[in-house]
Amino acid sequence: MQPRVLLAVTLLALLVSARAEEIQESSLLGVMKDYMQQASKTANEMLTKVQESQVAENAREWMTESLDSMKGYWTSLIGRLSGFLDSTPSS
């Protein structure tokens, strides 16, 4: 084989090998990019669920406090009305 042909074949083999490594690196980079996007999406979804859960918990607490307050007001009103009705003279 002539040295020029041997040199050309060697350079061609190196070029093909370098291109194959570049494709593998870009493929690996794509996989990592997809993984990071999926992880970010999952983290955002979980954060949203936690925030919604906290809002729901706050709403339940507010409703419980409001109902307890209304119950206390109603009990107080009934007590005053029954005291007022008991003290009124009957005819």
UniProtKB/Swiss-Prot annotation:
Disulfide bonds: none annotated. Its main location: secreted. GO terms for biological process: cholesterol homeostasis; lipid catabolic process; lipid transport; lipoprotein metabolic process; negative regulation of high-density lipoprotein particle clearance; negative regulation of low-density lipoprotein particle clearance; negative regulation of triglyceride catabolic process; negative regulation of very-low-density lipoprotein particle clearance. It is found in: Secreted. GO terms for cellular component: chylomicron; intermediate-density lipoprotein particle; spherical high-density lipoprotein particle; very-low-density lipoprotein particle. Residues 68-91 are annotated as: Lipid-binding. Residues 1-20 form the signal peptide. The modification Methionine sulfoxide is found at M63. GO terms for molecular function: high-density lipoprotein particle receptor binding; lipase inhibitor activity; phospholipid binding. Keywords: Chylomicron, Lipid degradation, Lipid metabolism, Lipid transport, Oxidation, Secreted, Signal, Transport, VLDL. The record marks K41 as: May interact with the LDL receptor. The keyword Signal applies. InterPro entries: Apo-CIII, Apo_CIII_sf. Belongs to the apolipoprotein C3 family. Component of triglyceride-rich very low density lipoproteins (VLDL) and high density lipoproteins (HDL) in plasma. Plays a multifaceted role in triglyceride homeostasis. Intracellularly, promotes hepatic very low density lipoprotein 1 (VLDL1) assembly and secretion; extracellularly, attenuates hydrolysis and clearance of triglyceride-rich lipoproteins (TRLs). Impairs the lipolysis of TRLs by inhibiting lipoprotein lipase and the hepatic uptake of TRLs by remnant receptors. This is Apolipoprotein C-III. It comes from Cavia porcellus.
